[in-house]
Amino acid sequence: MEGRAAGWVRVAAVGWAVAACAVAAGMVARRGAARVRWNRAVAVVRDLEERCATPAELLQRVVNSLAIEMFAGLASDGGSKVRMLLTCVDALPDGSEEGISYAIDLGGTSFRVLKVELGAGSTIINRKVEHQPIPENLTKGTSDDLFNFIASALKNFIEREGGEVEGRALGFTFSFPVRQTSISSGTLIRWTKEFSIEEAVGKDVAQCLNEALARNGLNMKVNVLVNNTVGTLALGHYYDDDTVAAVIIGAGTNACYIERNDAIIKSLGRVTNSERTVVNVEWGSFRPPQIELTPYDICFNNETWNYYDQGFEKMISGVYLGEIARLVFQKMAEESDIFGTAVDGLSTPFVLSTPNLAAIREDDSPDLREVGKILEEHLKLPDVPLKTRKLVARVSDIITRRAARLAAAAIVAILQKIGCDGTLCGSTQVRTMRGVRRRTVVAIEGGLFEGYSVFREYLNEALVEILGEEIAATVSLRVMEEGSGTGAALLAAAYSSARQKNSE
């Protein structure tokens, strides 16, 4: 009996050992499978990092390509990927403007109404700003409906603020591509961003607003039509006459700069009151051949209503960066289970905003608490492990870095075009005074640049890499809060004063 019992024990021990080995083998297999799935997610991120790399030599080629496109755009209409639109602005505010003027600033799914009171010596005595969201149906309805809504908002604003409107100057910032026919008129070339009112294309947008103002009983007319970059340039120049360009990096991106009239070949012979004219670059449509589109850029372009239009803008501006990140996270979820099994939240387009992306990148807490909160609240991904949160933050960093460095290259292209980058593209002597290199000021506006510190750091870092420390030290990026609308009011005041002087 004892021998038989001992045999049973030995059999049981062997069975237990076999079972334990099987369990251990299963655990090893599961760990191995989990490691494989994790490595797949990491591979997605590494591939993104390689495709989004922007070393200094690559950025310099982007600079050169954009500068060439700018030359071509100044030579002929339709000869370039960037439109290089003439703005008819040949004089900028100089600080002598006085009085009250109004402005409307339309550039996205909301607009601003402003009342600006100016005093002598570059003094803004008072500025009132009111933000007004635009209902989605008006972005796809009729031009009459849209401009009636804007005019009605201006009327209500004026009534609340009080004061006379008779003869008051009105600036209109309209941040969509327009072919300017005079300082106060221009025809819409096409819509960008969320707008698609097709019957408005080809219409004079200032006239559309004037008619809406009349329908609303307002005895005032647009006397200056500009886009947001020109408004920002005007405010920058109002404070500092070393301001040579303006850049918008917000929901969209674009730039303008002061150009010599003799460099604008397509308009030689045009009668102007100055030797220089502000040119609207429209660089959002630039497509740098040196920059490879990632699978996520391609997927995103295929899903948007404007397809492959505005390719440069889609890699830089605030409307799009969060969506690119979402597509990357979706791919990571397809390749692995790092977000768990319930990942339906990743399928909703634009559910992740660029402010969310910025908050993810700027979360410096040890456990990346804010990253986890955003993943749970916006993408419906609860209890994401810390190592996965780190991978999410890395994706946000890659997308941010590419955007900021491309924006820096575009800024340098303008500096190169006007000879402020230390090259022979223009006469660098223009920017010297008594042998000392003068400052070059670029006015800048937009929530992405103003509100995202890491973006600013990467942009400034790239400027130094491209320009070199000596030249970069002479370039100042100056933020202009409410620049586009305030600048339009300043220009309206400046041109109103000029007309009064000419009529006297």
Curated annotation (Swiss-Prot):
<dbReference type="InterPro" id="IPR001312">
    <property type="entry name" value="Hexokinase"/>
</dbReference>
<dbReference type="GO" id="GO:0006096">
    <property type="term" value="P:glycolytic process"/>
</dbReference>
<dbReference type="GO" id="GO:0009707">
    <property type="term" value="C:chloroplast outer membrane"/>
</dbReference>
<dbReference type="InterPro" id="IPR043129">
    <property type="entry name" value="ATPase_NBD"/>
</dbReference>
<feature type="transmembrane region" description="Helical">
    <location>
        <begin position="7"/>
        <end position="29"/>
    </location>
</feature>
<feature type="binding site">
    <location>
        <position position="193"/>
    </location>
    <ligand>
        <name>D-glucose</name>
    </ligand>
</feature>
<feature type="binding site">
    <location>
        <position position="313"/>
    </location>
    <ligand>
        <name>D-glucose</name>
    </ligand>
</feature>
<keyword id="KW-0324">Glycolysis</keyword>
<comment type="pathway">
    <text>Carbohydrate metabolism; hexose metabolism.</text>
</comment>
<keyword id="KW-1133">Transmembrane helix</keyword>
<dbReference type="InterPro" id="IPR019807">
    <property type="entry name" value="Hexokinase_BS"/>
</dbReference>
<dbReference type="GO" id="GO:0005739">
    <property type="term" value="C:mitochondrion"/>
</dbReference>
<dbReference type="InterPro" id="IPR022673">
    <property type="entry name" value="Hexokinase_C"/>
</dbReference>
<keyword id="KW-0934">Plastid</keyword>
<dbReference type="Pfam" id="PF03727">
    <property type="entry name" value="Hexokinase_2"/>
</dbReference>
<keyword id="KW-1002">Plastid outer membrane</keyword>
<dbReference type="GO" id="GO:0005524">
    <property type="term" value="F:ATP binding"/>
</dbReference>
<dbReference type="Pfam" id="PF00349">
    <property type="entry name" value="Hexokinase_1"/>
</dbReference>
<feature type="binding site">
    <location>
        <position position="192"/>
    </location>
    <ligand>
        <name>D-glucose</name>
    </ligand>
</feature>
<protein>
    <recommendedName>
        <fullName>Hexokinase-10</fullName>
        <ecNumber>2.7.1.1</ecNumber>
    </recommendedName>
</protein>
<keyword id="KW-0547">Nucleotide-binding</keyword>
<feature type="region of interest" description="Hexokinase large subdomain">
    <location>
        <begin position="227"/>
        <end position="482"/>
    </location>
</feature>
<feature type="region of interest" description="Hexokinase small subdomain">
    <location>
        <begin position="94"/>
        <end position="226"/>
    </location>
</feature>
<dbReference type="GO" id="GO:0004340">
    <property type="term" value="F:glucokinase activity"/>
</dbReference>
<comment type="pathway">
    <text>Carbohydrate degradation; glycolysis; D-glyceraldehyde 3-phosphate and glycerone phosphate from D-glucose: step 1/4.</text>
</comment>
<feature type="domain" description="Hexokinase">
    <location>
        <begin position="39"/>
        <end position="493"/>
    </location>
</feature>
<dbReference type="GO" id="GO:0008865">
    <property type="term" value="F:fructokinase activity"/>
</dbReference>
<dbReference type="GO" id="GO:0019318">
    <property type="term" value="P:hexose metabolic process"/>
</dbReference>
<comment type="function">
    <text>Fructose and glucose phosphorylating enzyme.</text>
</comment>
<keyword id="KW-0808">Transferase</keyword>
<keyword id="KW-0418">Kinase</keyword>
<feature type="binding site">
    <location>
        <position position="227"/>
    </location>
    <ligand>
        <name>D-glucose</name>
    </ligand>
</feature>
<feature type="binding site">
    <location>
        <position position="109"/>
    </location>
    <ligand>
        <name>ADP</name>
    </ligand>
</feature>
<keyword id="KW-0067">ATP-binding</keyword>
<feature type="binding site">
    <location>
        <position position="282"/>
    </location>
    <ligand>
        <name>D-glucose</name>
    </ligand>
</feature>
<dbReference type="GO" id="GO:0001678">
    <property type="term" value="P:intracellular glucose homeostasis"/>
</dbReference>
<dbReference type="GO" id="GO:0005829">
    <property type="term" value="C:cytosol"/>
</dbReference>
<dbReference type="GO" id="GO:0005536">
    <property type="term" value="F:D-glucose binding"/>
</dbReference>
<keyword id="KW-0472">Membrane</keyword>
<keyword id="KW-0150">Chloroplast</keyword>
<dbReference type="InterPro" id="IPR022672">
    <property type="entry name" value="Hexokinase_N"/>
</dbReference>
<feature type="binding site">
    <location>
        <position position="108"/>
    </location>
    <ligand>
        <name>ADP</name>
    </ligand>
</feature>
